[in-house]
């Protein structure tokens, strides 16, 4: 996904989360060489580490969420929690953005 397209998708995802009463804690958190977390949000004392994927259709976007990418996200989440000295409930979510809709997949690592 191009950076411009990615930024647009992330803005839509943030707006979507705010509409669901999430508090946006941080966006584009860079965890050194581990990777990046697109959106860190919080709701009901649970931190949500969100990966935003954008494509013309759902299937293409979801297929871009690979095991390797999930592994990097998990490492980035661990780094974030250690850096911020947080011991909190959390989950890793995916937000799939396409032209027509937004799909919110909570706790994708189960």
Task: Give the positions of each predicted feature.
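Active-site metal-binding core of divalent-cation-utilizing nuclease and nuclease-like domains
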Residues: 23-44
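Domain-level recognition of nuclease-like catalytic cores that cleave nucleotide substrates
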Residues: 83-110
């Amino acid at each position: 996904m191009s950076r411009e397209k990615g930024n647009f998708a992330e803005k839509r995802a943030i707006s979507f989360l705010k509409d669901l009463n999430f508090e946006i804690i941080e966006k584009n958190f860079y965890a050194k060489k581990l990777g990046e977390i697109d959106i860190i949000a919080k709701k009901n004392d649970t931190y949500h580490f969100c990966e935003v994927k954008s494509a013309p259709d759902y299937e293409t976007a979801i297929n871009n969420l690979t095991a390797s990418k999930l592994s990097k996200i998990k490492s980035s989440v661990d780094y974030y929690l250690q850096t911020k000295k947080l011991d909190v409930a959390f989950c890793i979510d995916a937000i799939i953005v396409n032209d027509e809709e937004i799909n919110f997949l909570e706790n994708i690592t189960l």
